[in-house]
Structure formats: structure tokens, C-alpha cells
């Protein structure tokens, strides 16, 4: 079997390492300041696009057992030849264009404001991805690895000093 080009094989290997490290070393939770009641969350959704020369077999379509640990699921996924030859992609959305909306037309990660019924930021990101793009991130073919760095974002949009 032919080995993948160095750039693709290296990229998949490095992506595997980064995701495994993100899972092992999650970023700490950053609480909201007392005066800030709103909170938002986004989902960084990555996929590996197979190349035409290395298409996945029908048995490698994400049937990974949910009883495996995240590390095992990552190891199993990145061990597949089509993944090693594939091209990583990030999902971005383009927000709707609306008059008066400060985010109008922006390119962004799927996500949005946390609702009271959301248990945590992860739940908010999962719900928002489902609402915005119809992608269910709770299925077995999705591997939830960890959280991105949290930060407090403040704005004076529309306020008068």
C-alpha cells in the first residue's frame, strides 16, 4: 500500500495529537462576571474529507462503540487509512444578513447564546449546531473531544458613556 503524501499524513497525525491533548488537558471554566448574565458557546466542528484515491470502506462509517473512551475512539478513527490520506476541514457558517444585527453576514463557528434549559456550554453548542445547520452532534459518529479556551467578552455596543 502506498503511503500518504508527507503533508497529508503529517497533518492527520498532528491533528490527532492536538485533539488527544485537548481531551487530556481541558481548559478551565471561566465564570461570568457578576454583572454579566449572558453566555454563549460555539462548536468547532472538524471532519476529514476522504480523497478519491482512498475512499472509506462501508465498514468504517463511524460505527465506533460509544463504550470506548474518547482516547480509544480517536485512536481508532485516526488509524484508518482513508483518514491518514484525508484532508481535514473546519465547518464555518455565514450568519444571515439582517438590518440592525451587529453579526449580520459574519462568517463564524456554529453557536450562539446559552438558553436557561442548557445544562452547560457544551449543551448550548450542541443545541445551536442542530438549530443552525441541522447537525446532530450527539450521534456515535461524532467524537466530543473537549472545550475551547473560554473567555469573557464585553461590549459597549449601543451604550452611551
Where are these regions (language model features)?
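N-terminal leader/linker segments that precede catalytic domains of diphosphate-processing enzymes
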Residues: 1-161
Amino acid at each position: 500500500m502506498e503511503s500518504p503524501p508527507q503533508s497529508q499524513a503529517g497533518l492527520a497525525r498532528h491533528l490527532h495529537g492536538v485533539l488527544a491533548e485537548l481531551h487530556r488537558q481541558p481548559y478551565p471554566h471561566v465564570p461570568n462576571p457578576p454583572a454579566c448574565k449572558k453566555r454563549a458557546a460555539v462548536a468547532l466542528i472538524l471532519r476529514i474529507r476522504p480523497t478519491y484515491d482512498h475512499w472509506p470502506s462501508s465498514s468504517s462509517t463511524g460505527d465506533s462503540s460509544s463504550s470506548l473512551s474518547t482516547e480509544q475512539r480517536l485512536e481508532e478513527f485516526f488509524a484508518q487509512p482513508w483518514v491518514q490520506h484525508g484532508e481535514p476541514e473546519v465547518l464555518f457558517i455565514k450568519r444571515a444578513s439582517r438590518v440592525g444585527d451587529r453579526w449580520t453576514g459574519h462568517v463564524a463557528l456554529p453557536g450562539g447564546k446559552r438558553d436557561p434549559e442548557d445544562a452547560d456550554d457544551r449543551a448550548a453548542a450542541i443545541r445551536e449546531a442542530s438549530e443552525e445547520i441541522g447537525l446532530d452532534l450527539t450521534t456515535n459518529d461524532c467524537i466530543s473531544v473537549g472545550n475551547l479556551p473560554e473567555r469573557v467578552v464585553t461590549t459597549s455596543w449601543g451604550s452611551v458613556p
